């Protein structure tokens, strides 16, 4: 009994010392079953591209685990925009939108979300689309990460991070793109069942973007927490023409081939100073993609 009490005290002390707090550690408001009960289709305003207006070949900028507010990480954002500008000057393929795979904030504090707001606005403004797309700011699509909801950060994330919802999808010529809420280490049953119905309802190839990896080198903390859910997802993806599962959370990154689809856990922006370009080609009978990793310096 004393050993159990001692271990509990150590756990409690560690939690109170990590800027999370006892209340947040033992019970967190806005669980996934409340945050994300369905995977909503984006409107034409939220995803401002039509099949006719989209080129067959295009790029997508991907970032993950920026962790604004973590003073340990280098200030990569100061170098990032110069690096991205140089990349775009030497590559002619249009870059249509950006995806951020969660953990934009480190503690979920309001001050961190102010920095997030400024950062995503700069991405949008400095990478405006061509005249064909009315020179609109480049859309930045977010998925929510576990750090984003610390300290009751969910509402701040929802207010700050476009498209202001945590589970959604859109379609391009040959693909369906799904963005899922795994910030609690699980999809939860409502989101899972809605996703399952939507995936089965379409034969198109599909991409999945979310924060938590499926496997992550077998490290429990960095993988989806429920082994049964993970097995269900792998089976579901194999049945419904999923081609890519793209995640963050595990900062060193990883790659796995499940025969039917591939899992890319991309390297983090905050810890490793990396961003990524997803190259898409929808000109053939089947879409083709590859992911290029760019060091900031």
For the regions a protein language model found, what residue spans apply to each?
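N-terminal active-site segment of His-dependent metallophosphoesterases
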Residues: 19-113
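C-terminal motif of bacterial Sec signal peptides marking the signal peptidase cleavage site
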Residues: 14-17
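A short acidic, helix-capping loop that chelates divalent metal ions and anchors anionic groups
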Residues: 70-71, 151-152, 216-219
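Sec-dependent signal peptide recognition
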Residues: 2-9
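Active-site neighborhood of phospho(di)ester-bond hydrolases with catalytic His/Asp-centered motifs
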Residues: 62-64, 96-103, 138-146, 180, ...
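Extended active-site neighborhood of metal-dependent phosphoesterases/phosphodiesterases
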Residues: 30-51, 109-201, 223, 229-238, ...
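Glycine-rich phosphate-binding loop signature in dinucleotide/nucleotide-binding domains
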Residues: 87-94, 198-204, 239
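Active-site-proximal segments of metal-dependent phosphoesterases and phosphodiesterases across multiple
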Residues: 203-244
